[in-house]
Structures are given as C-alpha cells and as structure tokens.
Amino acid sequence: MLKFIFMLMFMFPLSFLKNFYWTVQNLIFLLTFMFMINLSSLNYFNYISYYFGLDMVSYGLILLSFWICGLMLMASEKVFSTNNYEKLFVFMILFLLFMLVLTFSSMSVFMFYLFFEASLIPTLFLILGWGYQPERLQAGVYLLFYTLLASLPLLIGIFYILNSKNTLSFTLLLNYSFSNFNLLYLSLVFAFLVKMPMFLVHLWLPKAHVEAPVSGSMILAGILLKLGGYGLLRMFSLLQISGVKYNYWWISISLVGGVLISLVCLRQTDLKALIAYSSVAHMGIVLSGLLTMTYWGLTGSYALMIAHGLCSSGLFCLANISYERMGSRSLLINKGLLNFMPTLSLWWFLLCSGNMAAPPTLNLLGEISLLNSIVSWSWITMIMLSFLSFFSAAYSLYLFAYSQHGKIYSGVYFFSVGTTREFLLLMLHWLPLNLLILKSNFCMLWI
C-alpha cells in the first residue's frame, strides 16, 4: 500500500511540467490497475504501519477514488485546451486524491479526522477556481461552514475518547463500550450525517454541485459523499449500544426526507440540480440501511455507495457534455437532445436507468439489500420505501424524457456529435457499474 502512496507523492511535481496533463491521467489509470492486481483477501485489516491499514471497505473506496480522479482529468479536457491554469488544476486533483487515499487507510481516529477535513480544501479550491458563476463564492461558504460546524463536535468527541481510553486506534477501541454517554454519540455521528448528507442538513450539496466545474461535481458525488458513510461504518463499530437506542431518529428523517427530496427532483429545471438532489435521495436510503446495523444493511449501503459513485458521476459528465454544447443547464433549453446529439442518447438512457436501479446495475443489488434490511428493522418503513422506489424511477424517467424527447430548442441551428474522449469517459463509468454485479462478493462478503 505504501508504494501507491509514494507513487502519488512523486506525481505531484509532474503536474507542474509543461504538457503533462494526459501523462498524469495515464499514470492514475496505471495506479488503478496496479491497485486492482494488489487485491488479496482483505477481510481482516491489512496493516501498513500502526497508523495505516486497509480492509475491504477502504479497498473499494480507494479504488473508486483512483478511478474517478482519472476520469475527472478526462472530463475536464476544456481546462487543458483553454489553458485555464491546468497545472494547478492537476495538482489540486492529485492533492485531493492523496488526501482521500490517506483518509480511507487511516487506522487512528484522529488521523482519519485530519485527512477527512483536509479533503475539503482542494474541493473548495476546485469550486472557487474553476466554477462557472460568481455565486460559487456563496456555494463555497455553504460547503465550508456546514462541514466545519458539524466537525468541531467530532474533534471534541475524539479528544474525549483519547482522554478516557488513552488510545485512538480503531482496532484497540473495539474492546471498549461507549454506551453510557449520549452526547458523545451525537458528536461522533453528526459530522458524518452532514457529510452524507442527511435530509435537513443537505442544503450545501445542491449549491456546491450547481456551482462546481464538472471535475468538482464528479469528485463530490463520487467520493466525498462516501466519506460520511465510511466514517459512520467505522464509528458504529464503537457505538453499537447507543446506535440501537437512538438510530431510529436518523432513519425516520432520512426516509421521509428521501421521499420529499424525490418530489423536489420532479420540479427541477436545472440538470445539475436534479442530479444533485437525486444524490441526496439515494444517500438517504444508504444512511437508513447503514443505521439499522444489520449485515444486509451494511453490505447494501456499501454496494450502493460504490454504485452511486459511478452512476452519479457519469450523469454529471453527461450534463456537462450538454452544457458545453448548449451553454445552458436548463431543461427548457436542453430538450429534444435526441435530434441534437443522437449518439449520446444511448448513454443518457443507460445512466438514467442505472440511477433508477434497473438490472443489471450494481444499484439494484445495493437497493435490494437495503430494502431487506430496513423492512426487517421495522415493517412500517415499507410505506416510505415504496414511495422512494417509485419516485426514484419517476425522476430518472423525467430526466431522460424531458431532455431527450420533445421539440428541440429553436435557438439551436446545428447538429453535434460527441468526441471519442467523451464516449470513452461514459463507457468507463458504465462498464464497472454493470460488471461489478457479476463479482458482487466484494460488496457483500466483507464483514
């Protein structure tokens, strides 16, 4: 594992060399494939040192981080062609990737917290530096304040653990019980609920997505939302008793919120905002499954996190491809795209159907496991879950039908084809999404 961290470190100087944009991208893909070959049976912790170690959950998420970062560089070709500070841009992406790899392989709670917060900085720079509208400053402030405000109690909780137990190693803390202190439970969990994001504290996400460049949206939807889920997975190994007592609050909020957000999706005219709100709905069901703390729930939430990372990232790429041609994200202008870019309609269809968890995508596997776990936790949730599944299909269909069908916008006088780069980009999102269900033991057999 150390070899990958060092390779990433030595790639930093490459980002400042002239015309090394595609070289760095190829190196990230090389890194991904080397990391894939490196997979041994990681059901136990595979230690690098006292502070770093890997297990199956971290492995999948690190692999996803490598993959999405390679695809980010591929999607942001415009930064390179317009010479828009591309060296700094590549450096930001590499720095973010470095922070994410360290976050997912941290074994000490404090180091996890440190890298978890540090990954916010390059994301903020991506939004502020390469975003499209002046409102990106407001989006950046929202992102920063929501995350930092919720993370301060987490830091205090970590220091309390250090003070009372004299260790911060995840593996050693498993021996202790933290059942008697409810405030600690709240402080340790809340930061991750904001990062997920849970309904009621989700407002920063649509703002950040709408203002971010395509690379920012991809990494935000693909990896940064998964940090919250990963943190909860790690924390609930310590907070099991409190979790059984209090988790029903968050589950109820998430499920009701998921349905409300799905209704919000059906009223969106902005492509990016629609995809961002659909992320909140998906993360609501992931959060609910995770908080049931059952085997099905944990494995299903992990599977859906990986699947959503690929699917939602691909949808943001599609929205960006349309945005580059049309100059607008509005559904009122991006309509009748079947006439305008017929070659792209297939990809719209495939990724929208992935978003509604149609077979054979990995989303299906995740959602079925989550439905199982949440219904086994309480059968009353069936009402909300049935609404959630129905509206999930409804807004995915709405997105596809409104953007592809109908009369083409009268201001468009030309016909456009995608480039090979764009098709490869979409292919690399869609293939893993559908092939992973054939190798689902990685998602389902890691506990």
Swiss-Prot record:
Keywords of this entry: Electron transport, Membrane, Mitochondrion, NAD, Respiratory chain, Translocase, Transmembrane, Transmembrane helix, Transport, Ubiquinone
- Subcellular localization, as worded in the UniProt entry: Mitochondrion membrane
Q: Which InterPro entries match?
A: NADH4_N (IPR000260), NADH_UbQ_OxRdtase (IPR003918), ND/Mrp_TM (IPR001750)
GO cellular component terms, A-Z: mitochondrial membrane; respiratory chain complex I
Q: Classify the protein's membrane topology as the record does.
A: Multi-pass membrane protein
The portions of this protein that span the membrane are 28-48, 56-76, 89-109, 110-130, 141-161, 183-203, 213-233, 246-266, 273-293, 298-318, 331-351, 374-394, 409-431
**Domain of life according to the entry:** Eukaryota
Question: Per UniProt, what is one GO molecular function of this protein?
Answer: NADH dehydrogenase (ubiquinone) activity
The entry's family comment says:
Belongs to the complex I subunit 4 family.
Know the name of this protein? Answer: NADH-ubiquinone oxidoreductase chain 4
- Originating species: Anopheles gambiae (African malaria mosquito)
